[in-house]
Amino acid sequence: MTALTVMVQGTASSVGKSLLCAALCRIFQRRGLRVAPFKSQNMALNSFATLDGGEIGRAQAVQAEAARVAPTVDMNPVLLKPEGDSRSQVIVLGKPIGSLHARDYFAYRGELKDIIARSLGRLREAHDVVVIEGAGSPAEINLKDRDIVNMHVARAADAPVLLAGDIDRGGVFAALVGTMALLEPDERARVAAFVINKFRGDLKLLEPGLDMLTARTGVPVLGVVPYLKQLRIADEDSVSLEGRRRRAPAGPGELDIAVVRLPRISNYDDVEPLEHEPGVVVRFIERPDEIGNADLVLLPGTKSTMADLAWLRASGLAEAVAARARQGGWTLGICGGCQMLGGAIEDPEGVESAEPAARGLGLLDVWTRFERTKTVAQVRARLAGGSFLGPAGAVNAGEAEGEGAGELTGYEIHMGRVERVGGAAAAFAIGSRGGKAEPALDGAVSADGAVVGTMIHGILDNDGLRRSLLAALRERRGLPRAAGEPAIPSRHEEYDRLANAVEASLDRALLDRIVGLDRR
């Protein structure tokens, strides 16, 4: 039987569509249904590697995990990774097809519609419910004739639409009514209910507004979802990153981690596990004076290493980071950050830049050569030497014992090759890629152990390694070690917390009627 569908659209970006979809995936999964997420086209710099080596938006990987299914490229058949100047790398069914200007990309929409329809069809054949996420707003009237992600998909899937608005930013009633006013009659008819998201306060005070909203539009309110604090679920939207730049400085007993906020930052969810650790303050910085007395400086991934390296030099951060590292300051680079910490960076084919070559910061003995072949893989690895950062043995993979002890997981997403030179020590020894044995060495460690680079995203998601790193940082500062391991919820516990809050806020009977579950 073909799967039922439900679609979450929003009045704007960052109203909570991705998390609402993740909640619905977990809600339906807990009822014993086979659930899959779907987003036809995603524009994001946070991406994820599927087991078969495809690249999809991070949000759909999160939603798949919430649904307890393996992420596949059909869940996000088109991914756009912005490169600047109205250009994006276009990834179709997990593979890059090139970099296109927005005007050129729109010429492909007919072909993309067919690809999207086939992906959606495969998901519907294999599952009971498909939870579909829209993008931005369906009321972008200047783009409506090019739509392949909002009402076009709702029609193709015959999906009822839940229209979400963010009350925390203000103006939610105007946003919902205004969106409905700009939709075509057939599109308005497809909107089955409203969801008010991120509510704080007394619901009784909101109820008159909800009644007026339904009276004006004829659309019921499915529920009012509370503002949920400190969810350990990866963000995708750059809007969420903006808020995290304005963090208070670390207190006397807290660890201070400074993340360089590169203009083209990508996969910045690499640092989220650090943000959720007690006694740790993560700051995003853009100026040399903001480094302060940071215990760790982290250079994250970037969509354009060459361009962001030029920005790093122009901002003065390159010199400041290098000077600090040469004095023994601990520094970590992930993916593009690893490349920047190295020496020669070559781009003879113009994969990333018109510049054929550049020099990194010279803190690691690695050489980078960009090539058109893209590496996308889930990996399993171990520490290659005595330590991850600091003196040998200071940081390890944790205290686990038995089969799999010391094994780390993550994923690679990068163009070209990064190789060690001059006998540099590797950071990690990869054992497998994509579930297949493929031994290789990754990254590099400086001679004094103060600087480490790796091409593996998600490495700090490994609890043992992360906590060992934080313990070493505390010891270096003379701070007491944490009293035992903090009780940090697992991601699945967080999906349940999210689902519990959303399910308690929605009219279940109405939701079942909208989706069609009352008839099955």
Curated annotation (Swiss-Prot):
SUPFAM superfamilies hit by this protein: Class I glutamine amidotransferase-like, P-loop containing nucleoside triphosphate hydrolases
CDD domains in alphabetical order: CobQ_N (cd05389), GATase1_CobQ (cd01750)
BP terms from Gene Ontology: cobalamin biosynthetic process
One Pfam family hit: CbiA
Active-site residues (renumbered): 335 (nucleophile), 457
Record's keyword terms, sorted: Cobalamin biosynthesis, Glutamine amidotransferase
InterPro entries: Class_I_gatase-like, CobQ/CobB/MinD/ParA_Nub-bd_dom, CobQ_GATase1, CobQ_N, CobQ_synth, GATase_3, P-loop_NTPase
Residue ranges of every copy of the GATase cobBQ-type domain listed in the record: 254-465
A GO molecular-function annotation: catalytic activity
Pathway annotation from the record: Cofactor biosynthesis; adenosylcobalamin biosynthesis
PANTHER family: COBYRIC ACID SYNTHASE, DETHIOBIOTIN SYNTHETASE
Family as reported in the entry's similarity comment: Belongs to the CobB/CobQ family. CobQ subfamily.
Functional description taken from the UniProt entry: Catalyzes amidations at positions B, D, E, and G on adenosylcobyrinic A,C-diamide. NH(2) groups are provided by glutamine, and one molecule of ATP is hydrogenolyzed for each amidation.
UniProt-recorded name of the protein: Cobyric acid synthase
Organism this protein belongs to: Sorangium cellulosum (strain So ce56) (Polyangium cellulosum (strain So ce56))
Gene: cobQ
